């Protein structure tokens, strides 16, 4: 049973729609995404949040939690990560993501990756198999737009290429289409990637004024229609479903 001191935790609210278990390896994130909700959620400033560091004793704490979950015959995958990116630039130095995957696997736990790290994440493809999932967040297809909203994340093409290579290796793939910044671009992402993506999860844009410029009813209708037409496996988050 997980406790308040556990680093593997059961997300609440909107995050629970993406994964029932998660672990955050780093405090903060170096991708500096303009729309990121994590600083507010963690009650810290963006300046502090954008100076990431490994969480203290994180691997040892994962071992404690993973051992407990194995004894309980846990079947749910553990997501890396919600409040940071597992393959942000400093992971090249610390390689916590690789070590965390190895620990989780040693206790028969599956992993679900969510990243904007692009090629950095491919380092660990040799570890992913079976019921593991590799996923990326995609908000746009234009490099200049990406540099505006996600200045230090991998560019969109690099993320898409990493998805394709994961698919070629037989790894289950998924895309988080959240936040939605430009609905027509989100639809185009689906058209360009559906042949090598096993699941799409689609949300909205929360806690940002740009959200008011989007016709959410139209987007919800259009994206559901497209995903159905292409026979994709998909999940629409509650924030989007309410617009249907």
Q: Locations of the language-model features?
A:
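Short, glycine-/Ser/Thr-/acidic-enriched flexible segments
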Residues: 55, 85, 241
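N-terminal [4Fe-4S]-dependent radical SAM core
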Residues: 1-77
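Conserved AdoMet/S-adenosylmethionine-binding subsite of the radical SAM
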Residues: 58-227
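Acidic carboxylate-rich catalytic motifs and surrounding loops in phosphoryl-/glycosyl-chemistry enzymes
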Residues: 115, 179, 230-244
């Amino acid at each position: 049973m997980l406790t308040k001191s556990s680093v593997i935790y059961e997300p609440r609210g909107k995050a629970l729609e993406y994964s029932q278990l998660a672990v955050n390896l780093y405090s903060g994130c170096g991708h500096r995404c303009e729309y990121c909700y994590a600083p507010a959620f963690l009650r810290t400033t963006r300046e502090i949040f954008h100076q990431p560091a490994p969480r203290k004793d994180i691997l040892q704490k994962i071992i404690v939690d993973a051992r407990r979950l194995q004894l309980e015959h846990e079947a749910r995958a553990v997501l890396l990560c919600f409040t940071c990116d597992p393959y942000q630039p400093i992971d090249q130095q610390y390689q916590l993501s690789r070590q965390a995957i190895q620990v989780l696997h040693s206790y028969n736990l599956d992993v679900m990756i969510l990243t904007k790290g692009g090629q950095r994440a491919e380092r660990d493809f040799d570890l992913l198999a079976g019921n593991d999932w590799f996923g990326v967040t995609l908000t746009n297809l234009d490099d200049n737009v990406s540099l505006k909203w996600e200045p230090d994340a991998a560019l969109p093409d690099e993320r898409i290429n990493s998805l394709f290579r994961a698919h070629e290796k037989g790894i289950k793939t998924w895309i988080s289409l959240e936040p939605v910044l430009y609905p027509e671009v989100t639809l185009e992402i689906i058209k360009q990637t559906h042949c090598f993506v096993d699941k799409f999860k689609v949300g909205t844009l929360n806690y940002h004024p740009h959200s008011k410029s989007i016709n959410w009813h139209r987007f919800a209708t259009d994206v559901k229609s497209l995903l159905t037409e292409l026979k994709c496996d998909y999940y629409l988050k509650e924030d989007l479903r309410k617009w249907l």
